[in-house]
């Protein structure tokens, strides 16, 4: 019989903005956002919940955010501050278990299956972690507790902010049936639209499709979809998690018709990329890459061997790549390649 696992996913609430709020309490009752300080070309990194009440969201162009909330306060990103807070939080995770898989500065998976303290209750452990984070940093985070990573991550988003949601093994079937398929790991806009064209919008809909059909339509990922629709996820929490790459991309509502327009997007993409990187990622960089998709959906990318994340090199790659394209740009992606791998295999996207 397979041993039931106890997985916790911790996701800090509006992390960058919350850190800024803690540093400057006068912001607490005001709508504010981090990043996107250029009102014409900027993009919001994150915002507090007061700003969200006005409709402001992460990745929203600053111009639109200011239309929705004219009195929105814009702050520059301060990654040194965010990384310092993240280091304290991560130390707390390791106090409770060695099985920690960081995903970014503000979220991680923890496997507490073998933790004997707190009556071996994942719920009590999650409560203790949240309390310890608050005691040491003054920050709140939300936790999801479930038998696997898939469900724990989904659960952590349910009662935000400062939430805790538990999915017990007996609740898995009822929990997943009404879940939108877009909540499933690996389902992006393309997969979501493809599933929708097949009449699939919820996990219950997805359960009606055979394994053979899903593999035929989605290849290897079809097998994962088949399991995810049933709340099954066998991925382990990997405490020595080795990522082959970290990348970000953005699709723009208005086509980028000039090199200058493309270069103006680099700062926000760079901030977004660095926010997803841990200290371990920085130590194992072997290359950087830039990708374009034009208005005719042609994809082009360039890579360079590099040991550091160099914004100037990214800028030069954008310039070089732009010279190869004859059409306006719809999407820009940037990223780093990690680990020891042949340069010819540097395809992040």
UniProtKB/Swiss-Prot annotation:
It is found in: Cytoplasm. Its EC number is 2.7.7.7. GO terms for cellular component: cytosol. The keyword Glycosyltransferase does not apply. Binds 2 magnesium ions per subunit. One of its GO terms (biological process) is error-prone translesion synthesis. The active site is at 107. Its cofactor is Mg(2+). Mg(2+) binds at residues 11, 106. It is an enzyme of class 2 (transferase). GO terms for molecular function: damaged DNA binding; DNA-directed DNA polymerase activity; magnesium ion binding. The record marks 16 as: Substrate discrimination. The keyword Repeat does not apply. It catalyses: DNA(n) + a 2'-deoxyribonucleoside 5'-triphosphate = DNA(n+1) + diphosphate. Residues 7-188 form the UmuC domain. Belongs to the DNA polymerase type-Y family. Monomer. Poorly processive, error-prone DNA polymerase involved in untargeted mutagenesis. Copies undamaged DNA at stalled replication forks, which arise in vivo from mismatched or misaligned primer ends. These misaligned primers can be extended by PolIV. Exhibits no 3'-5' exonuclease (proofreading) activity. May be involved in translesional synthesis, in conjunction with the beta clamp from PolIII. This is DNA polymerase IV.
């Amino acid at each position: 019989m397979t041993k039931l696992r106890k997985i916790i996913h911790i996701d800090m609430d509006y992390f960058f903005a919350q850190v800024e709020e803690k540093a400057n309490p006068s912001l607490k009752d005001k709508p504010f956002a981090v990043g996107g300080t250029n009102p014409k070309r900027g993009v919001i990194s994150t915002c507090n919940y007061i700003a969200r009440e006005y409709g402001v969201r992460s990745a929203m162009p600053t111009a639109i955010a200011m239309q929705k909330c004219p009195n929105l306060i814009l702050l520059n990103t301060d990654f040194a501050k965010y990384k310092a807070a993240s280091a304290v939080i991560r130390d707390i995770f390791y106090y409770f278990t060695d099985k920690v898989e960081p995903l970014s500065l503000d979220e991680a998976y923890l496997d507490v299956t073998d933790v004997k303290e707190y009556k071996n209750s994942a719920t009590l452990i999650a409560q203790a972690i949240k309390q310890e984070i608050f005691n040491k940093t003054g920050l709140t985070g939300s936790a999801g507790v479930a038998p696997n990573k898939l469900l724990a991550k989904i659960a952590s988003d349910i009662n935000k902010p400062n939430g805790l949601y538990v999915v017990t093994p007996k609740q898995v079937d009822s929990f997943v049936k009404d879940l939108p398929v877009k909540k499933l790991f690996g389902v992006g806009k393309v997969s979501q639209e493809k599933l929708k064209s097949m009449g699939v919008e919820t996990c219950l809909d997805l359960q009606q499709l055979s394994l053979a059909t899903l593999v035929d339509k989605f290849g290897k990922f079809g097998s994962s979809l088949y399991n995810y629709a049933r709340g099954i996820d066998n991925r382990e929490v990997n405490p020595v998690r080795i990522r082959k790459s970290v990348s970000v991309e953005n699709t723009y509502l208005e086509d980028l018709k000039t090199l200058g327009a493309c270069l103006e997007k680099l700062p926000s993409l760079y901030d977004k990329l660095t926010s997803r990187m841990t200290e371990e990622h920085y130590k194992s960089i072997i290359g950087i890459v830039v990708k374009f998709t034009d208005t005719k959906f042609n994809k082009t990318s360039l890579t360079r061997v590099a040991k550091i994340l160099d914004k100037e090199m990214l800028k030069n790659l954008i310039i070089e790549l732009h010279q190869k394209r004859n059409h306006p740009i719809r999407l820009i992606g940037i990223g780093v390649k990690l680990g020891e791998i042949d340069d010819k295999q540097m395809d992040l996207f």
